[in-house]
From Swiss-Prot:
Organism listed in the record: Escherichia coli (strain K12)
Protein name (Swiss-Prot/TrEMBL): PTS system N,N'-diacetylchitobiose-specific EIIA component
Statement: the UniProt record of this protein carries the keyword Phosphoprotein: yes
Effect of D92L: Eliminates the need for a metal cation at the homotrimer interface by substituting hydrophobic methyl-methyl interactions in place of the metal cation
Subcellular location: Cytoplasm
Length: 116
């Protein structure tokens, strides 16, 4: 992983940052996809599978959040990092995935209560 304490000045470092940001998008998307798959399992009454998928979703989201935290720490609120459209897209993916997981957790609990 690139050194996020030194925000890129060269094309190679910019490419490394883009790779890190793409990882953020991929992990966020994975977290959201797994959460929706868990909801599908809950609708079918398979709460063990739903829980396992939500656990996997949490791990993917934790990976994404770790990258986000390092990016924020690297910038330290000083505007060192150039904000690209891809970075904004990655942040959007992360936030929508976090929201989806929170809502899906509630929906799974409701399905569980309804099936009891």
């Amino acid at each position: 992983m690139m050194d996020l304490d030194n925000i890129p000045d060269t094309q190679t470092e910019a490419e490394e940052l883009e790779e890190v940001v793409m990882g953020l998008i991929i992990n966020s998307g994975q977290a959201r996809s797994l959460a929706y798959a868990a909801l599908k399992q809950a609708k079918q009454g398979d709460f063990a599978a739903a829980k396992a998928m939500m656990d996997q979703s949490r791990m993917a989201l934790n990976e994404a959040h770790l990258v986000q935290t390092k990016l924020i720490e690297g910038d330290a609120g000083e505007g060192k990092m150039k904000v690209s459209l891809v970075l904004v897209h990655a942040q959007d993916h992360l936030m929508t995935s976090m929201l989806a997981r929170e809502l899906i957790t509630e929906l799974i609990e409701l399905h569980e209560k309804l099936k009891a």
